Every structure is written in structure tokens, then in C-alpha cells.
Amino acid sequence: MSRTLKLAASAALLLVTGCRRTESESAAAPPASYYDNSGHSDAWTGGARKITISTPKGPHQLWIKRIGNNPKLKLLLLTGGPGLSHAYLEVMDSYLPGAGVEYYHYDQLETGESDRPNDPDLWTLPRYVDEVDQVRKAIGGDKSNFCLLGHSWGGLLAMEYALAHQDQMKCLVISNMMASIPAYNDYARKVLEPKMNQAVLKQILDIEKTGKTEQPAYMNLLMPNWYEQHILRRPAAQWPEPVLRAEENMNRKFYVTMQGPSEMGASGRLVNWDRFNDLKRITIPTLVISGKYDTMDPAYMAAMVEQLPRGELAATNGGHMDMYDDQPTYFGKLIAFLKKLN
């Protein structure tokens, strides 16, 4: 074949390949209506706005941010902690828009850009369930379109919400949260802690006994020996900026009151929470996301799926923040689940 023919053939091949790629990308891209901001009062603020909710102690304002337009599927993101802002879930922005998912970042009361009344009387599960319901109404969510994705504490809250209001839900995603705090604590004590350097573990437990968990020495021990192993599996110096921003802006008092001083088990108000036997009452489609190296027992998470009448399991090769550790699996499974419902 002459050099001219070879060039022509190559050009034709590139043209065909390019057309196929464009067609594929076009098929995968969200429709133009996804970017339609008609009728949205938040169009001038990039989707962000404040909404007012009622509480037993009076009205408060919450920060929410809408991304996309899809009246058939509205996904509300519930952050973990308790006490973390929406910042660490900004990773969703790299994946969900391409799938045409309308979703909402949301700072719970006492976190991020929302009001921080610093009132422990408001730190109860029933009140937070009511808060989520008020946010649902504010974004126009109902049984035809409303889905919750709760990560960690947000997963606990999402389970509680579904048990109270699944008649207003289309689907549920439980990300990295066991349905029992006692079982979560057992996994830490009986499985994860025995694998640690026992001298380091003793130092950590000794600090906890003294109550001096706010001292740098405590986190200096936890970070390489627990957080880098089970929370986000890379050196802390390489943690993504959104995660660091969420940590820096964390409501520590809220966190310690509800969870305890660290991620090495729970000792706060949530210590006796257990809903495993109630999972069978959640009849909407539910995706359970579990990380191999998480502080949440993968075998227990698989058992949760068996309890859920319409449960599905997404097992990742990551830790507690597997939306960073194993993005192909996390977002591949999440988007496939949501697309079936869209």
C-alpha cells in the first residue's frame, strides 16, 4: 500500500473512531434539560441557597446546593461525622452530573454553612429525621423522585429516615454504615484492634482514659495507625483538599457528643443505636456500599443486604471513604443503581 493510501486509510479510521467516540459520549451525556435552570430561584447562586426550618428551639437556616435538573430523581446527600460539612462529598461533582443525577449538597444543622446554635438539646435522632423531611419538602422531593444517600452517620440518619418516611422515598443508599453501633464497636474491639501494634493501641487507650483526647499526641497516634488504614487509605499528607476542609471545619463538640472522641468505635449518645432487625421494614430499592478495609464490618454489611427486601451490595476495595479509595467501583455501582431508577 502506498504511503498516500496508508495516510488516507489512517485518516478514515480516525474519522470513524472519532465519530464513534462522539456518539458514545453523546449517548452517555445528560440531556440538555439537565442544565435547564428555568424556574429555579438558585440559578444566580450556582444552585446554592439557604432554607429556613423549624426546630423545638425556633427557626434556623440550612445551606443546600442543587446540581443539575432532573425531576425524576432528586438525590439528597447526608454527610457523616456527625459534624462534617458537605465539603468532603464534593467528590460527587466529578461523577454524578455526567449520569444526569439531580443531587443536593446539604450542611446539617450545626455544620458547615448552616446555623450553629451549639445547642445539645437539638442533637437528637428524631429532630434530625424531621430536619431531613423539611429539606425534602424544600427541594420538591416525594415518592416519585426522592432518594437519600447517607455516608457514615449520614447512613445511620438515612436508615432512620427511611423507617419513618419511606412512603416519601424512591430509593435509599447506605454508604459505609452498619445498622448497629454495638456491632460496629464489637468489630473494632475484636477484629481491627488486635491487628494493631499493641503498644500503640495501649497508648491510645491510655489517652482516652485520661480524657485528654484533644491533645495532638492522640491524633498523631490515630492517624497512621487507624485513619490511614481504615478511613482514607493514603498518607494524611496526600488527603484530598475537600476532606481536609471538612475536617478543619468540623463541629468537634457535636461529633464527640454523638460519636465519641474518634473513629475507633462509638461511645457517645449513639452507643446503643441498633436497627438491624428493622431493616426488613425498608421495602424501597436500597444500595449498601461497603469497603473491604472500612471500620464497618464487610460481612455485617453483606448481612444487611440479606435483611433488606430489595437490597443490593456494592463491595469496594477501599476504606471508610471509598468514594476516594476506590472510585471506579464506588461510582460505577452507585450510578448503575441510580440509572435503573431514573
Question: Which residues fall in each region the model found?
Answer:
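C-terminal motif of bacterial Sec signal peptides marking the signal peptidase cleavage site
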Residues: 16-18
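Conserved HGGG/HGGXW glycine-rich cap/lid loop of the alpha/beta-hydrolase fold
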Residues: 60-116
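Active-site loop/oxyanion-hole signature of alpha/beta-hydrolase fold enzymes
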Residues: 108-149, 153
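Conserved hydrolase catalytic core segment
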Residues: 144-187
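Flexible "cap/lid" loop of the alpha/beta hydrolase fold
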Residues: 173-213
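Alpha/beta-hydrolase
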Residues: 202-280, 284
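Conserved loop-alpha-helix segment in the C-terminal half of the alpha/beta-hydrolase fold
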Residues: 276-318
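Catalytic active-site module of serine/aspartate enzymes centered on a nucleophile-bearing elbow/loop
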Residues: 310-342
